[in-house]
Amino acid sequence: FVIHLLNCSDGGVVSARPNQIKEELKIEDKAFGIYGSIVQVGRIIGTLSVMILLNFFNRKYLIFSALCLKSSTFLIYFVTKNYPIIMVFRFLQGFSHVFTYVYFPTWVHQFGLQKYKTVMTSFIQTASPFGSVFGFNATTFLGAFNYGFALLAFTILGLNLILLFMPDEYFSPSIFFYKNVTEEHEGRESTYSLFEVDEEKMKQKQAEKSKKPEGPSIWLQLLRPVFATIVLARTVIMFSFMGLHYWIGDYFENALGQDGKFAKASIYSLVSLLGPFLGSMTGAAICECFGGYTKKHSSLLCFVFSILTGISAIFTPMVDSLTYFTILLFLFFFFANCMMPILIGISFNCVDKKIKGASSGVNSLMCTFLGNLPAPSVYGFINAKYKDSNKRLAMTLNLNYIWVNTVLCFANYFFRLKEKTEEELRE
């Protein structure tokens, strides 16, 4: 968990000292935006290759190598300030990040105690927001972004050495399974391999599948307006979140004139942790009160939350008071995250069970391509062009982009209502 947390901390380091990074690398807002987006490109390429590499190479040494590579990308700032070279290492930083991000939750699922798996999986997912806050706070108090990166690099390397001395079986589910499966009535190791068990299960599943009627094709389901509008709605939220997280430090210093360590650290910690957590819990609870995300009214609930998020977005860039800014930003995160569990639930509910994995992959890929990837660069280009006349314009547009989500949530409600009516007419 600690390694996973540190692996997710680099975004917080960049957010804490944006102006310092621009000065050290001698770049402007446009280049700084691309500096953020290139990491997402690395993550996309890493995601496409990680599962292949994990299946063909020793997992322990692969994870060890990925963490060593990640640490080296943090230390490059002590060697050179050349922007093109830094960008290559930023790409590698995103590429190496994926290995632990993908494998550690899988490791918990394979080796975690059965009755604690859900808790352990949820716990390890908190590493991402906590890591971002840790990186932000550590860099804020250290005073320099390269010191923040150095702290992450040497801490990860130290913990990485511990992984190196762990037995291989802790990284390979097949070895672990083979060594520990026993036949109770004989008290000896089972002679059945994973492949034999999987083959038997596969035959059973194929027999069950042959009895079921064929449903709509995968692409027809993924291109349905109900699914497409939900995916795009999540993409809009991820775009606003990414732009906000990446540029929040710049906004603190240049628009609000706040460079105090305590103010920046406390506000970022509050809105980044408490807002999303309380929002997700509240949204899920309210949705359950209205019958859950399987009901068409859940889309209308997202529409209401989206309007409340949009109202917060309108006023957040208008205020100068740090207190009011904190309250409004908290409300923005709170109401936006009220939608997230409902949107995820609807996206799973509107496709057949057999393609839920494919729908999840499409959902994640779209959020990265249309949300996380372009957000830092788009914000940077707007900020570079208009910051002399309006330092808050980029943040205003980034936050109010959430109104597109409002339109999509209403459209989703309309399409679900239409499908329900068509089903009733057919019956």
Predicted feature locations:
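Extracytoplasmic
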Residues: 2-29, 244-249, 375
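Residue-level signature of mid-helix packing/kink "hotspots" within the transmembrane helices
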Residues: 12, 39-48, 98, 132-133, ...
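Extracytoplasmic gate region of multi-pass secondary transporters
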Residues: 14-15, 224-281, 337-340, 344, ...
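Conserved MFS/SLC helix-loop-helix module at the cytosolic interface between two early adjacent transmembrane helices
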Residues: 45-83
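Structural signature of the two symmetry-related core transmembrane helices
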Residues: 61-75, 297-314
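Cytoplasmic helix-loop-helix junction between adjacent transmembrane helices
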Residues: 89-128
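Helix-loop-helix hairpin linking two adjacent transmembrane segments in secondary transporters
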Residues: 124-172
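Symmetry-related core transmembrane helices of the 12-TM Major Facilitator Superfamily/SLC fold
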Residues: 147-165, 393-412
